[in-house]
Amino acid sequence: ISLGTPAVRVNSDAGVLGISGSVANPIGLTIGGLGDHDVSGAISGTSFVTKDGAGSLLLRGNNSYSGLTTVSGGKLFVESSNALGSTATGTTVTSGASLQLRGGVSVAAEPLTVNGSMVAGDGALASTAGINTWTGPVTLGAAAVLSADADELRISGSISNPGFLLKSGKASALGNVKISGIISGAGMVEKIGDGVLTLSGNNSYTGFTKVTSGRLE
């Protein structure tokens, strides 16, 4: 599929819309609606990819697009370590949206900005199956939740928290979150839900640390 001008919007209002062919994206691609989308073909180009609407988007391809990835609604599932394209401009998750890693992926060097909390009980950054790793720097622009349904979410990149509440955990979920990156800033850290939160970095954040439920190591 070759996208022209202006930027293209793809909507699914019910069921699952599957795209298995490659997508050339020179201008911009927004995927939304109430339905779900499964994109297994590789997305290339220099422009952005945006997920909005209440449905879900699954990216499974070895993508190389270099624009910003924005999750502004629903859930974006990542099943490829390169699903989010080039690390040049990073990924942003807004309030009411969730970026979910599954299947044992390792997203390397991708900057992540989190400007919202959670959707349907899932964290703004979540692990849904397997041991999934985020190695890039994370910046909080608002209170945020990190969660794992099962197995582990590992974060080795630094976390900059200038004054917000960073929560980890999910009710009735046994997955664990391990943060080896350094948490800095004036913000707070709270362990919620079931499972274990492990902090192994030389952290310098100055806000409180609170264990509401589960275990903190």
Language model feature labels by segment:
Residues I1-G61, S95-G201:
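Extracellular, surface-exposed repeat architectures
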Residues G55, V71-L76, G193-G195, V211-L216:
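Glycine- and acidic-residue-biased ligand/ion/polar-headgroup-sensing regions
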Residues N62, S81-A83, N202:
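Short beta-turn/strand-loop junction motif enriched in small, turn-promoting residues
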Residues L68, G90, A109-P111, P137, ...:
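Well-ordered beta-strand positions in beta-sheet-rich domains
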Residues K75-A83, T87-R102:
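Repeat-solenoid scaffold signature
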